[in-house]
Amino acid sequence: MSTAVNVPSAVRPADKRPIASFHPSPWGDYFLKYVPCDQVTQAKMEDEVKKVEEDVKKELRKLAKAVGKPLELLNFIDVVERLGVGYRLEQEIEDLVQAIFDNDKFGVDEFDLYHTSLWFRLLRQHGFHVSCDVFGKFKGRNGRFKDSLASDVKGILGLYEASHVRTHGDDTLDEALVFTTTHLKAVVTNQPNHPLVPQVTHALMQPYHKGMPRLESRHFIAFYEKDPYHDKTLLKFGKLDFNLVQALHKKELKDLSRWWKDLDMHAKMPFPSRDRVPEGYFWTLGPFYEPQFALCRKFFLQVFKVTSIVDDIYDAYGTIDELTAFTKAAERWDRSCLDELPEYMKVSYASLIDTFEEFERDLAPQGRSWSVKYAREEMIQMCRVYYQEAKWCHEKYSPTCDEYLEKASIVSFGYNLGTVVCFLGMGDVATKEAFEWARGNPKVVRAAGIIGRLMDDIGSHHFEQGRDHVPSAVECYIRQHGVDEVTAQRELGKRVESSWKDINEMMLKPYMMPKPLLTRILNECRIVDVIYKGEDSYTFSNTTMKKNISHILTDPIPI
């Protein structure tokens, strides 16, 4: 697996450093100061949530048995999931959606636009390959969606949300996305007082299917509370659970902030690295916010942070000679290599080894220490790819866009490593076969990498090109095809959408791997869509990122 590392002929002076400037995190020690509630209060919160949960389960069972109430059942399932409490009723919901799919007499042919769209989206999101021909009844003789639908704002919004679960060949959904986007924008402009305008505005910015589940739940709770027909029990369930889980997240973030502060990595680096623990934890909540994934979050955040420093070393400080030594040391993965590294690199290298050894200790009680080797191999591969990009920058080499995506950039975004690390804390569902599959760079992992890499490059290329840096996908595309920046971004955006179709196909039955593992990959794509939509809100974390962290990690929701 190891590849030789050769020093390229110098083009840029070997000791010139491409130093970047990163602002400090706006959060400081905010989460370190968090004081968890006492055990009595915690137990009371848990008991209250369980009590309401039982009431919701009773209502769900009642709706499942009711004859002639398919719309109520669809709406109930959707609200439960959008409130963020679907994980508490996961098996009940799976069984009901299976029954809906199996029921030829469910009545979808008689549904209006909103409920047809809801039926379609729910089934697709639960893995059922239902045909988009079901929307044919809303088209005119010309084969296009009827303009008369424009007055049905709720229905248009539902169709818009459904269009984002499209796969390759779903031409009707491609048409639906264009049609609904046009009409929803008109609603915002021409009907600013329409009660659905806040929800429409949010959806146009962040489609539900591509949104970070935890953040989307926070927004939906606010929208649902203003719905005059909301179910009070469901709303209470969503709020109570949100606050309970938020308390857990804040306790975890406090502990992880202490871990990072004790490492003192930021102070030990001779350059301004991205000191982003709350931001990194926010990213971690993308793949898994549910309480049972605490170990997954610990692993992901710790790898995220130590890798972020390594990334900054390759990308924003190290000379080519230093990076050659670091890459060789990474390939050997041995503490004896410390003597061969500059002082500042010793700190980062030692933290890498320490972190992965800690993972082995954490997983030893489960008999799963063996799985850490897969993450370690991906970390080594990441260093090789970082080095490849550093050589390109050093040699002033501009790869074609295809070469850039194929040889380096997809891996350097971290999805291959991130996917394997996601699997580490998942328990027995993450078999050796699953790790081998993930390390084999399957189509879906490549698609996720393309989404991440291209969205990152589109959002950050102006900042990155303000210093010595490998060309982004935008620059590579411009040079390869002789187009302007706007055209390059539009064409790369099409590749992002095509990759999303690959992701959506992955989530349809029969699953290539257990669904819990595939969901982590889907959720990684979702968090990237949130963080890199139009900007790099991880690097520049004092605007959109700060607002999003505030939404889900600061104040509880008033009951």
Swiss-Prot record:
The question of whether Protein biosynthesis is a record keyword is answered with no
Q: Which cofactor does it need?
A: Mg(2+)
Ligand binding (Mg(2+) 3): D456, S460, E464
Q: Which cysteines are joined by disulfide bonds?
A: none
**The entry's keywords:** Lyase, Magnesium, Metal-binding
Q: Which InterPro entries match?
A: Isoprenoid_synthase_dom_sf, Terpene_cyclase-like_1_C, Terpene_cyclase_plant_C1, Terpene_synth_N, Terpene_synth_N_sf, Terpene_synthase-like, Terpene_synthase_metal-bd, Terpenoid_cyclase/PrenylTrfase
GO process annotations (BP):
diterpenoid biosynthetic process
What catalytic activity is recorded? (2E,6E)-farnesyl diphosphate + H2O = (5S,9S,10S)-drim-7-en-11-ol + diphosphate
* EC number(s) from the headed UniProt entry: 4.2.3.194
Name the family the entry cites.
Belongs to the terpene synthase family.
Gene Ontology terms, MF aspect: magnesium ion binding; terpene synthase activity
Tell me the classification of the organism that encodes this protein: Eukaryota, Viridiplantae, Streptophyta, Embryophyta, Tracheophyta
Protein name (database record): (-)-drimenol synthase
